Amino acid sequence: MKKIILIAFSFGILSVNAQQIKLEPGKKITSTSTADMDMDMGMGGQMKIKSSSVNVLSITGSDDKNYKGTNTITKMTMSQEGMGQSTEYDSDKKGDRDSETGKALGKELDKPVQILIDRTTGKATESNPEKTTEPEADTNPMAGVMGGMSEKTAAAMVSSAFFIIPQGKKAGDKWSDSTTEAGIKGVRNYELQSISKEEATILLKIVSKGVISKEIQGMQMEMNMNTTAQSIIRTNVTTGLVKKNSTTGTVEGTLDMMGQSMPISMKMSSEVVFE
């Protein structure tokens, strides 16, 4: 009986603390992410890409609804092999920063972005969003293609640092939601795999499909993509802060450009650790 009471008490703590994230002014959250991607674009057009980045979220204040802060990308690395070429980039190396690749990848480096974080949902928005340009796409079509497939705003980076478990959920419970953004419709299915007084593990399965349109060198390009992905998320149930997110996924689709259609197949994996 005592054990049952303790378990019930743990669930009670989860239900209360999951309602809002908890942050203190001056707190810094560092996220270190790594990603691997293998892509096949048909006709021998294969490419391997490895990348990593470090983001620092600094909490500067709060009000009744939001936390205020800044998000800064402090480090980026990338290696790319394919189509007879290879590229290496490390933002810590001055020579790499001054290269064409460095100028394209480093445009957001060390640039603080003002962020608002909803206390209840953990969703982040940019306080003063700026319209970004993509000069690299004018001279490098592949950069434009990759940009269209991997765009991630500062707000999205920050949002991934938080996970709010719906009130009353217990181990084994499942729920779902859906999103529509930038021409992509997705369905997300969650399962609360385990929970303790301080930590929970969530299995997230995502299925999405849609079309992304971009203009590169005056030419219209469309990417039709069907994506399936699976994530294991470890989160602190008291604060709502994610500790680790590990994801694997596949993309199948086509790239339509200049009257031609090219098949695209991609496998990807990523890991983000928050400290």
What residue ranges belong to the model's regions?
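Signature of exported/secreted
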Residues: Q19-E275
